[in-house]
């Protein structure tokens, strides 16, 4: 029998396959969409392998070419639309032999695999066997020499799609933050019934051998106790747990009790700690009415959150670039993220480290297992311990190291402000410091610092701050007032309350406030104290950081709004919605939201708007709708930052599109306004608030016992904590190389260099806008 016919010469365009394997995770559809569109943009062809490795083994109609329009609307869909399965056949060589044959027949010699460590290991084994598989296919007559000759090299690129976030070498896996969102939503809902009946709840979350979901949900919800596989409790944990819960309820007046347990939790002797066992202990020892809630597969479902949408998109784009960059001898890469930076690392290094963690746990080598988790995991665990056990005698500092720390919010409200304050208060109480909340910003301080019996500066009790764990906005009040309006009164109030340090949470106004205080130190020695800014603003425009608290909450709120608007646009078929985003003169929110919702175009202040740009976009829309005859999901979204242009307002842009459409399609304007500030903070803003606030407290604490002149001489005594690339660091505000002099665009209230600007190109590529012509989309270019 003659072997099946396949192209003797390789196809003109390179063919890249994409598959999703293992357990499904929100964001997998974003990967497929990004790979397909980036491949087409790079003059390649994209093929989807349906049902994971099973589709690769069976071939035929389970390997299909996908075109640009086929993946429209996929970003907002949960699960994986190309299917996933755990394929036992592929684990055996005969199965991989069939898979190799099917790939050659389809002309595919590159594969992007999105799955867990097992799926990625299988992909790397497949690549290592590839030459031998082709040789065997020729020897057995399944294929000819001519058929296999163009496909001697197989390129594999891995993407980690897993809700467990159990892969070493990356801060986050695709789907983990969406899963964390489901958990936090569930626990937030449990709060009300737990409070009403003074009940305890034991909540079991997924994660297998990794405690990331359990740890982050415990931080996000202020859980009283936590069980994770990497750090089993010491013997006698039952007594310790009961003691903490009793103290929280009887001494601190806490009405609800939450215990988070990972499904793989065990003690130091590897005995499983089940949720039912914990419930029995609380019921029998404390006589506490306790319920067990096993969240199960609800943690996998639903649409991807904002973070997983843009992460899957950027990693999918990077995967195609990695395929095109790969050399034959190079190891297969896996695409990872460290803080805000997309990176590549050898796939098998990451897999091996991940498996080593599991082995250490099985060998009771828990310190080694913890050491192999990324530094972020260890920092979060440290922060949780230091903020969940106040008054612990082992953690208290000596009297001469204790400080009076002022805490103030400056600027517009942002998700995470309350959580940062809660973390700071809890850390202060744990270490013996005195946390002093300054209510209603600097104007509140100056007007009411001398009031009686209640003034604007008050000590914060643990009971008060603990209630802020999932509250949005700012409970101590915030506004845009600056100390420069009345420096003398500000200094007088600082002296009255004896502030030893100042913790400022807020946006560009907070940055400006600390700058004013720093510059006034010579005239007012009261300001010769350590001061640090924790950026919190939906605009994400604070110099010294690539991430601000509140920006993720804003993004999630905005994509929910856009998803609903897109549904309306698609139902009306030929309709464009122009949506106005906030963000001041920074286009961060508009750009990242555009990436997360698949916007056709994004207008930002950094690029501006002019008539030529609008004309090109209207032509682009006209061509799109002309090709879309009879297509589903045909609604379009354009995002416009509120300050992109003073002339071309959101309504004007919508009206121009409608006028130029000549009845072929229509447009509407939508302005979500302050809705974008969000309600409850997102889990990412909650956990980063804890981590960053704890780091700020450690930084301020390091100045205890130093003289005023020593503090003023240290450039880091007035600083901003921020994420830069793959690092979290403090940057000095003053000095020749400080943020004020080198990185701040004071006129536009944003950093001089904005890391996210290159994302505009990705938005344009994935919308098809970039391929219209090679002209720049910025009306400021060459101006």
Curated annotation (Swiss-Prot):
Ranges of compositional bias, category Pro residues: 1-10
Q: Where are the stretches annotated N-terminal catalytic PFK domain 1?
A: 1-389
Q: List where in the cell it is found.
A: Cytoplasm
Q: Which UniProt keywords apply?
A: Allosteric enzyme, ATP-binding, Cytoplasm, Glycolysis, Kinase, Magnesium, Metal-binding, Nucleotide-binding, Transferase
Q: List ligand-binding residues for Mg(2+).
A: 117
The UniProt record gives the binding positions of beta-D-fructose 2,6-bisphosphate as 480, 537-541, 575, 582-584, 642, 668, 674-677, 749
**EC code(s) of this entry:** 2.7.1.11
Indicate which residues the UniProt annotation says bind ATP: 23, 86-87, 116-119
This entry carries the following GO cellular component terms, namely: 6-phosphofructokinase complex; mitochondrion
Pathway the protein contributes to: Carbohydrate degradation; glycolysis; D-glyceraldehyde 3-phosphate and glycerone phosphate from D-glucose: step 3/4
> Could you say how this protein's activity is regulated?
Allosterically activated by ADP, AMP, or fructose 2,6-bisphosphate, and allosterically inhibited by ATP or citrate.
Enzyme class at the top of the EC tree: transferase
Positions binding substrate in this chain are 162-164, 199, 206-208, 263, 291, 297-300
Q: Catalytic residues?
A: 164
Annotated SUPFAM superfamilies: Phosphofructokinase
Q: Which InterPro entries match?
A: 6-Pfructokinase_euk, ATP_PFK, Phosphofructokinase_CS, Phosphofructokinase_dom, PKF_sf
- Function statement: Catalyzes the phosphorylation of D-fructose 6-phosphate to fructose 1,6-bisphosphate by ATP, the first committing step of glycolysis.
Give the family per the record.
Answer: Belongs to the phosphofructokinase type A (PFKA) family. ATP-dependent PFK group I subfamily. Eukaryotic two domain clade 'E' sub-subfamily.
Q: What is the protein name stated in its UniProt record?
A: ATP-dependent 6-phosphofructokinase
Q: What gene name does this entry carry? A: pfkA
């Amino acid at each position: 029998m003659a072997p099946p016919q396949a192209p003797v010469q390789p196809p003109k365009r390179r063919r890249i396959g994409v598959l999703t394997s293992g357990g499904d995770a929100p964001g997998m559809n974003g990967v497929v969409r990004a790979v397909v569109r980036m491949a087409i943009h790079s003059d390649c062809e994209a093929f989807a392998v349906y049902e994971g490795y099973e589709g690769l083994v069976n071939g035929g109609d389970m390997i299909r070419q996908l075109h640009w329009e086929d993946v429209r609307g996929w970003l907002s869909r949960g699960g994986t639309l190309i299917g996933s399965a755990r394929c036992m056949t592929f684990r055996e060589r005969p199965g991989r032999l069939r898979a190799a044959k099917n790939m050659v027949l389809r002309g595919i010699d590159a594969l992007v695999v999105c799955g867990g460590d097992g799926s990625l290991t299988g992909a790397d084994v497949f690549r290592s066997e590839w030459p031998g598989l082709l040789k065997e296919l020729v020897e057995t007559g399944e294929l000819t020499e001519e058929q296999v000759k163009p496909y001697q090299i197989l390129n594999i690129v891995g993407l980690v799609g897993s809700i467990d976030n159990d892969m070493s070498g990356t801060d986050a896996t695709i789907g983990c933050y969406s899963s964390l969102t489901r958990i936090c939503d569930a626990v937030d809902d449990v709060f009300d019934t737990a409070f009403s009946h003074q009940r305890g709840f034991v909540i079991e979350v997924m994660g297998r051998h990794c405690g990331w979901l359990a740890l982050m949900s415990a931080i996000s919800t202020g859980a009283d106790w936590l069980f994770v596989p990497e750090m089993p409790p010491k013997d006698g944990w039952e007594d310790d747990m009961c003691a903490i819960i009793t103290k929280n309820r009887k001494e601190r007046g806490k009405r609800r009790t939450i215990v988070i347990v990972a499904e793989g939790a065990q003690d130091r002797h590897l005995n499983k700690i089940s949720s039912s066992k914990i419930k029995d202990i609380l019921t029998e020892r404390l006589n506490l009415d306790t319920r067990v809630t096993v969240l199960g597969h609800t943690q996998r479902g639903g649409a991807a959150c904002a973070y997983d949408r843009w992460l899957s998109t950027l990693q999918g784009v990077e995967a195609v670039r990695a395929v095109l960059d790969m050399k034959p001898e190079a190891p297969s890469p896996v695409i990872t993220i460290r803080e805000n930076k997309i990176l590549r690392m050898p796939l098998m290094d990451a897999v091996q480290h991940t498996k080593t963690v599991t082995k250490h746990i099985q060998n009771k080598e828990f310190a080694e297992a913890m050491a192999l988790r990324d530094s972020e995991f260890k920092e979060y665990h440290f922060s949780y311990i230091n903020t969940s056990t106040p008054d612990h005698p082992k953690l208290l500092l000596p009297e001469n190291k204790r400080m009076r720390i002022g805490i103030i919010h400056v600027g517009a409200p942002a998700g995470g402000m309350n959580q940062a304050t809660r973390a700071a208060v809890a850390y202060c109480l744990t270490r013996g410091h005195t946390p002093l909340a300054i209510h209603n910003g600097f104007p509140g301080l100056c007007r009411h610092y001398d009031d009686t019996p209640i003034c604007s500066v008050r000590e914060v009790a643990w009971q008060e701050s603990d209630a802020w764990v999932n509250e949005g906005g700012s409970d101590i009040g915030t506004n845009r007032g600056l100390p420069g309006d009345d420096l003398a009164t500000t200094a007088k109030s600082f002296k009255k309350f004896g502030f030893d340090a100042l913790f400022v949470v807020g946006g560009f106004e907070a940055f400006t406030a600390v700058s004013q205080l720093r510059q006034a130190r010579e005239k007012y020695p009261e300001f010769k104290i350590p001061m640090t800014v924790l950026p919190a603003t939906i605009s994400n425009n604070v110099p010294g950081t690539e991430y601000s608290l509140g920006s993720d909450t804003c993004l999630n709120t905005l994509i929910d709004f856009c998803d609903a608007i897109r549904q309306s646009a698609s139902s009306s078929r030929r309709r464009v919605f122009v949506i106005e985003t906030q963000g001041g003169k920074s286009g961060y929110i508009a750009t990242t939201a555009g990436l997360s919702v698949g916007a056709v175009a994004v207008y930002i202040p950094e690029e501006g708007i002019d008539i030529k740009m609008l004309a090109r976009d209207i032509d682009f829309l006209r061509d799109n709708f002309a090709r879309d005859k009879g297509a589903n999901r045909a609604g379009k979204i354009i995002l416009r930052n509120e300050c992109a242009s003073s002339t071309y307002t959101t309504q004007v842009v919508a009206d121009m599109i409608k006028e130029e459409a000549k009845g072929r399609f229509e447009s509407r304007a939508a302005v979500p306004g302050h809705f974008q500030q969000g309600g409850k903070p997102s889990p990412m803003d909650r956990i980063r608030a804890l981590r960053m606030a704890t780091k700020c407290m450690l930084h301020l604490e390091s100045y205890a016992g130093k003289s005023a002149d020593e503090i003023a001489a240290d450039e880091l005594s007035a600083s901003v904590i921020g994420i830069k690339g793959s690092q979290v660091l403090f940057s000095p505000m003053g000095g020749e190389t400080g943020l004020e002099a080198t990185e701040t665009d004071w006129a536009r209230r944003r950093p001089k260099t904005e890391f996210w600007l290159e994302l505009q190109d990705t938005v344009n590529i994935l919308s098809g806008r970039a391929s219209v012509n090679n002209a720049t989309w910025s009306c400021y270019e060459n101006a």
